[in-house]
Design a protein with these regions (language model features):
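Long, low-complexity serine/threonine/glycine- and acidic-rich segments characteristic of extracellular
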Residues: 145, 187, 202-205, 212-357, ...
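Proteolytic processing hotspots in large secreted/extracellular or virion-associated proteins
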Residues: 445-449, 472-519
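Surface-exposed, glycine-biased beta-strand/turn segments
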Residues: 22-104, 111-116, 131-140, 145-146, ...
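Bacterial Sec-dependent N-terminal signal peptides
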Residues: 1-29, 33
């Protein structure tokens, strides 16, 4: 095939880069790091570095703790505590230890720190009057030795259950793969597992089984390997996606595959080797996977090609970034090989048969289609039209501005004609078929890497050069009777991922008397509201978002809820909750003095932590809780001193 010579050159470079990366990482001896939970005892993981989560590549490893909190967490090597973070979300309670080799280990979702660190943190929290802190102690204030107990495991922050999250980072704070350091506590003899492969046409002239679009194929397992028995017919530019994951011994969890290689006729065309993930590029995860499939089905497909806007640098490919071109009748063997960190491997083998265009070989039609409809796949508009009763296909007339274009059907599926329009040629506003006109809701083509201002009657948007990964086709809409009294603003399709913030202005037709408590909320498919914020500027309300979809305006005039659980001289515990805009802040004072209250959003509880354990909690108690809309709830009570009882 035409790309073979290029592939051989790329492959040689790839092995050199791969070897250099491996050598740099493994300059650290295997026994340099101690396993931080029950060292020397067999353990299992709930997550690995490079695993596909719903919003990101998982970093580090999630070490299971038997469903309990409070296990000793050990320093992995000599060093000093360089950072301490406390947050109700994210990593929760976390320690960062810098080591003599320049690397940093991270221990997250902790229940509590050891006494000296704990007292230092509490002192800083009282000094700053804030539960959430990000501290950088003086170097060697807290020196540690390998094996020291530095904390106890927990479930703090955005943790779904008790475990220890453990990172190893290089001197630039990029995340490395802890399993590369050969911890004997983890056993993995299971090979990666494949569930599906997907092929996608990359332009309107390409076909898969003589059809345009994206098509998934189930696989058949044979030992640790997988096959697709029947050849898949292809023509033109084709991209490949893989739904696969790794598994480890004695655990049900799906974990990450760090290395995937795709070959055509024994020539490598794509390789990904995930050994390092820089946080500055982490949002590119949305362009590594098929984001649209994630949103529609929840499945996480690896793209085995480098899509436009993807800035990760752990790929090596052919000259077309992993996209395959088939233009000569021939049958080709594709092999996709997967390795996990422990070099367990499996492969998927299938044949691709390049044929010249003809009618589809598997005429299944489009079930339930009884009228014309359309969809967009990347840069192509696909129009489906039921063939008239006389059985004759008719050309479609596409209208774009003052121009019209007569387009024949690209192919026919049973009783449905399929018409393809390249949107980079121009945005059609309508199509006429059999004297029936269908209008398209495509309001603008928004380019990436350019600033762009969008204006409509109810929505305005400002896109920066970094807002988008790739060109999108924006559709906006407005419903003046949402939920009977509100209004709904439709801003694009959530099939598109967003790299960085888009500044959006909503221009409502309705009047909102209490603007101070009226804000923007995103609305999901189930009708749930999520606070997005916004500030009023004349008749517009402006906010920033990294999500396309539906938005509405809601006035929240209901204050948060406060429920006392424990109030005595030793401990204060409250449950706080807000049913719409969410908790923004809380503050508790005793005799006008600020009291530290830890916060766990999962349980909605706050609880007191004394600066001086010997000092009883007594006097005038005032707890103020404020939501994101500015509503405030105040609880007042008095704690009597012991000699007043």
């Amino acid at each position: 095939m035409f790309y073979r010579k290029t592939i051989l050159v790329v492959t040689g470079f790839m092995f050199a880069a791969y070897g250099l990366c491996y050598a740099q990482m493994n300059s650290v001896p295997d026994d340099y790091y101690l396993f931080p939970i029950k060292p020397g005892n067999r353990n299992t993981l709930a997550g690995t570095m490079g695993e596909l989560r719903s919003t990101h590549f998982h970093t580090g490893i999630d070490i299971r703790t038997g469903g309990v909190q409070g296990l000793p967490v050990h320093a992995a090597a000599d060093g000093y505590i360089s950072r301490i973070a406390v947050s109700p979300n994210g990593y929760g309670n976390a320690l960062y230890i810098t080591h003599d080799n320049g690397q940093t280990t991270v221990y997250a979702h902790l229940k509590e720190f050891t006494a000296p660190v704990k007292q230092y943190v509490i002192g800083e929290q009282y000094k700053r009057k804030s539960f959430q802190v990000n501290l950088f102690p003086p170097k060697y204030k807290f020196s540690v030795h390998k094996g020291d107990t530095i904390a106890h495991s927990g479930n703090s922050g955005s943790s779904a259950g008790p475990h220890l999250h453990f990172d190893i980072r290089n001197d630039k704070q990029a995340v490395l793969n802890p399993l590369e350091y050969n911890f004997e506590e983890i056993i993995d003899t299971r090979a990666p597992e494949v569930r599906k492969i997907a092929l996608k046409t990359m332009d309107k002239h390409s076909r898969i089984n003589n059809r345009f679009g994206r098509f998934e194929f189930n696989v058949i397992k044979s030992g640790n390997h997988y096959i697709i028995e029947e050849p898949i017919q292809v023509y033109g530019s084709i991209a490949v996606e893989l739904y696969a994951y790794d598994r480890q011994d004695w655990t049900k969890f799906h974990t990450g595959i760090n290395e995937i290689v795709m070959e055509i006729d024994n020539q490598e065309v794509f390789r990904q080797v995930i050994r390092e993930i820089p946080f500055s590029k982490s949002r590119n995860f949305y362009n590594h996977i098929n984001y649209r499939q994630l949103k529609e089905t929840g499945l996480r497909f690896h793209k085995l090609y480098v899509d436009n806007g993807n800035e990760f640098d752990f790929y090596t490919t052919n000259k077309d970034k992993g996209i395959l071109t088939f233009d000569t009748e021939c049958e080709h063997e594709m092999v996709i090989t997967m390795h996990d960190t422990y070099r367990n491997w499996s492969f998927l083998k299938l044949n691709l048969r390049c044929i010249l265009l003809s009618e589809p070989t598997a005429d299944t039609g489009i079930p339930g289609l009884d009228e014309s409809t359309y969809e967009i796949l990347d840069n192509t508009l696909i129009v489906y039209s039921v063939i008239p009763e006389n059985g004759r296909s008719v050309p479609a007339v596409f209208f774009s501005g003052l121009s019209s274009y007569l387009i024949d059907a690209s192919y026919t599926l049973d009783n449905v004609d399929v018409y393809l329009w390249d949107l980079t040629f121009g945005l059609p506003d309508s199509v006429e078929l059999c004297n029936t006109k269908e209008y398209f809701s495509i309001d603008a083509m928004i380019p990436s890497v350019k600033e762009y201002q969008f204006y409509s009657h109810n929505i305005e948007a400002s896109f920066s050069k970094r807002s988008l990964f790739d060109t999108i086709f924006l559709d906006v809409g407005y419903d003046p009777d949402f939920n009977g009294t509100g209004e709904l603003f439709l801003f694009g399709s959530d099939q598109y991922p967003v790299r960085s913030n888009i500044e959006v202005s909503l221009i409502p037709d309705k009047i909102y008397p209490d603007r101070d408590r009226t804000h923007v909320y995103s609305v999901d498919d189930a009708g749930n509201f999520y606070f997005s914020g916004g500030t009023w500027d004349g008749d517009k309300i402006k906010f920033k978002t990294r999500t396309f979809g539906a938005y509405t305006l809601v006035e929240d005039s209901i204050p948060p809820e406060i429920r006392p659980l424990i109030i005595n001289s030793e401990k204060l515990v409250f449950k706080i909750n807000d049913k719409l805009s969410g908790i923004k802040s809380y503050e508790l004072t005793l005799n006008d003095a600020w009291v530290l209250m830890n916060y766990d959003p999962k349980t909605r509880q706050i609880w007191s932590v004394k600066l001086d354990e010997k000092q009883p909690l007594e006097g005038r108690l005032v707890l103020k809780v404020t939501d994101n809309a500015g509503n405030e709830k105040v609880h007042k009570s008095k704690i009597l001193s012991q000699n007043q009882y």
